Design a protein with these regions (language model features):
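Basic nucleic-acid-binding alpha-helical/helix-turn surface characteristic of O6-alkylguanine DNA
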Residues: 1-98, 148-156
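Short glycine- and Lys/Arg-enriched binding-loop motifs that mark or flank ligand-binding interfaces
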Residues: 4, 47, 61, 100, ...
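Gly/Ser/Thr-rich beta-alpha loop segments that engage phosphate groups in nucleotides
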Residues: 10, 84, 106, 125-128, ...
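Regulatory, non-catalytic segments
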Residues: 98-113
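Short Lys/Arg-enriched helix C-cap and helix-to-coil transition segments
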Residues: 114-121
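…primarily DNA-binding HTH/wHTH and HhH modules…
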Residues: 126-156
Length: 156
């Protein structure tokens, strides 16, 4: 399912268990995708972008990822709306204090960006780093998401 958002098009996919993917690039949709899950995801994302939702109540079905990555993705869900933490702080939270770069890689592999809020993780010096592989467009999206959550002042 494709949806238009203030940060561009998002493509969603789900299986019978839960949401499997959110992508900024077109994806092959599961022909057996659960339409109710996709419809709920679309509604909740639209509410988020309208400033009416701060957390998501969607079932996930994450088939890929290492145990470490899944631990990171779980910890990301604990970062409150409108707040940020550094890669180092997140590494300490998951009790792998030297795994700062691995945290960045896990964020990059996050199958459900926005819903699993990897955009809330910033560099040690407070700079925005590492969204969608450090592409310029990715950092613009990260900034927009943080501005939406009022974690950053809006830049005109």
């Amino acid at each position: 399912m494709k949806i238009n958002t203030p940060v561009g098009c998002l493509w969603l996919d789900a299986d019978q268990v839960g949401l499997t993917a959110i992508s900024f690039e077109p994806i092959d949709e599961n022909s057996r995708a659960d339409q109710k899950i996709l419809s709920d995801a679309k509604m909740q994302l639209n509410e988020y972008f309208a400033g009416q939702r701060q957390s998501f109540t969607l079932p996930f079905s994450i088939q890929k990822g290492t145990l470490f990555q899944k631990k990171v993705w779980q910890a990301l869900q604990e970062i409150p709306y409108g707040q940020m933490c550094t890669y180092k702080e997140l590494a300490e939270i998951i009790t792998h204090p030297k795994a700062v770069r691995a945290i960045g890689q896990a964020n990059r592999m996050n199958p459900l960006p926005i819903v699993i809020p990897c955009h809330r993780v910033i560099g040690q010096n407070g700079q925005l780093t590492g969204y969608m592989g450090n592409s310029g467009e990715g950092l613009v999206i990260k900034r927009k998401l943080l501005e939406l959550e009022e974690a950053l002042p809006k830049i005109k």
